[in-house]
Amino acid sequence: MSKQQEQDTPSFGEIRQRLQAGEDFDLAHRLQEREYEMYYNHNRNVNGTIVGDRKKTREEQIAEDEHAASLRRLGHAERSMSDEEYARQLQEEMDRLDASIQMDKEAQLREDARMAWLLQQESSATPAPSRHSGDLISFEDQPQQSSNTTTSSSCQSANNS
């Protein structure tokens, strides 16, 4: 072999070093690929979990909202029924009160009619009271005075002549 060839031919140590460098590069490349794959899989799992959780959360929220809406409807229905019952009771009470007032008015009218009839019977059964009242002056009850009579007689005589 010539010197030129010997110089161009790498030594065993160099070849071994190059092979080790190639193996190291290959190993580093495989490790890096594995790391990327693990990171990618981890992200995919996390994102899948997030998406799944988001869907599940949305479904649970919808179910909870529907349940709350049904409870509100039930509460409204119960309040409506209790309001209707209360209104019915109030109406019955007002009807009873109106009936009681009407019966009281009718009883008062009957009592007034009875009293009027009694007064009429009493007034027709007793003799008519004298026209004179203790407060009034009656000219019929007064004794005639002679001076008035003479005065009126003389006035009449003078008028006649």
UniProtKB/Swiss-Prot annotation:
Regions annotated as coiled coil: 82-107
Region (Disordered): 1-20, 55-84, 118-161
Membrane-spanning parts: none
Biased composition (Low complexity): 144-161
InterPro entries from the UniProt entry: CCDC50, CCDC50_N
Biased composition range(s): Polar residues: 1-10
Keyword annotations: Coiled coil
Keyword Coiled coil: yes
Pfam families xrefs: CCDC50_N
Presence of keyword Coiled coil: yes
Protein name per UniProt: Uncharacterized protein R10H1.1
Originating organism: Caenorhabditis elegans
Native organism taxonomy: Eukaryota, Metazoa, Ecdysozoa, Nematoda, Chromadorea
